[in-house]
From Swiss-Prot:
It is found in: Secreted. It holds the Pfam family ApoC-I. Its main location: secreted. This is Apolipoprotein C-I, basic form. The gene is APOC1B. It comes from Pan troglodytes (Chimpanzee). InterPro entries: ApoC-1_sf, ApoC-I.
Length: 83
C-alpha cells in the first residue's frame, strides 16, 4: 500500500522539479545579487564591530587584560633579574 501511494507522489514531485523555474522566478540580475551581498557584508561588519566594542568595554575582559599585563610584567622582571 505504501508503494502504491508513494509512486504518484514521487511522479508529482519529479514533474514539479523538472518543470523548471516559473518566469517570475527566472535568474535574478547580477546587480541585485551584488547589492544583497553588499548589504549582507555591511550588516556583518556592523555586528562584528559592535561585538568587538562590547568585548572591549566588558568589565571582565578589562580585568583579564589588566591581570595579564601585570603577570607579563612580573615575568619580564624575573627574567631580567635572573639573566
Amino acid at each position: 500500500m505504501r508503494l502504491f501511494l508513494s509512486l504518484p507522489v514521487l511522479v508529482v514531485v519529479l514533474s514539479i522539479v523538472l518543470e523548471g523555474p516559473a518566469p517570475a522566478q527566472g535568474t535574478p540580475d547580477v546587480s541585485s545579487a551584488l547589492d544583497k551581498l553588499k548589504e549582507f557584508g555591511n550588516t556583518l561588519e556592523d555586528k562584528a564591530r559592535e561585538l568587538i566594542s562590547r568585548i572591549k568595554q566588558n568589565e571582565l575582559s578589562a580585568k583579564m587584560r589588566e591581570w595579564f599585563s601585570e603577570t607579563f610584567q612580573k615575568v619580564k622582571e624575573k627574567l631580567k633579574i635572573d639573566s
